[in-house]
Amino acid sequence: MKITFYGHASLAIEVGGKHIIVDPFITGNPQAAAIDINTLKADYILLTHAHGDHVLDVETIAKNTNAVIVSNAEITSYYAKKGFNSHPMNHGGSWKFDFGKVKYVNAIHSSSFPDGTYGGNPGGFVIEGEHKNIYIAGDTALTYDMKLIPLRTKLDLAILPIGNNFTMDVEDAIIASDFIECDKILGYHFDTFGYIEINHEESIKKFFDKGKDLMLLAIGESIEL
């Protein structure tokens, strides 16, 4: 399983011979100017919620690739009405795709499209593929619901927001890593705007002091599990 960071909360995942894009917000992020969305491969586009900084480039990528949009029922209905392929899910449900299993789990946030359309309840994803398990939290506060995840799944990596203001901060993300019983964390949703700027060295040290590994990738950088 290969995971590439495209800035903010945008990710690419290669697993089971398939290409997945998560929450594409690339053209609106000056820090990701080197990423050409017209060259991205996508069999699936996973969306945690409907905010503009998570869905800006969905339609362009979906048109280019004919990817299947996977999200909650409200978000997939929104795109299905526009003619896009979609697979609806909802909280607590899972589905076996051709690359692995996806479960849609709870997040505490808000969710509406830039045009005001209701975007359903926000969520996150637990993905199981190639004998590796990851958790993509989406935009969320710290929540006791996270404690449910390790009851069913032993995680190899968790991708957690750490920018504060709109989501958890670093301290809450450390507690979240305890809840999900995963000490290998990829941080995201930071530094894109002034509201969510972080001190990288301090953040990494705070995790290290708790015996945990916080990775902060450069845009375009990848890790493999």
Curated annotation (Swiss-Prot):
SUPFAM superfamilies: Metallo-hydrolase/oxidoreductase (SSF56281). Pfam families: Lactamase_B_3. GO terms for molecular function: hydrolase activity. Gene3D superfamilies: Ribonuclease Z/Hydroxyacylglutathione hydrolase-like (3.60.15.10). The keyword Kinase does not apply. The keyword Disulfide bond does not apply. Transmembrane segments: none annotated. Keywords: Hydrolase. It comes from the Bacteria. Belongs to the UPF0173 family. NCBIfam families: PRK00685.1 (NF001911). HAMAP family: UPF0173. This is UPF0173 metal-dependent hydrolase Fjoh_2786. It comes from Flavobacterium johnsoniae (strain ATCC 17061 / DSM 2064 / JCM 8514 / BCRC 14874 / CCUG 350202 / NBRC 14942 / NCIMB 11054 / UW101) (Cytophaga johnsonae).
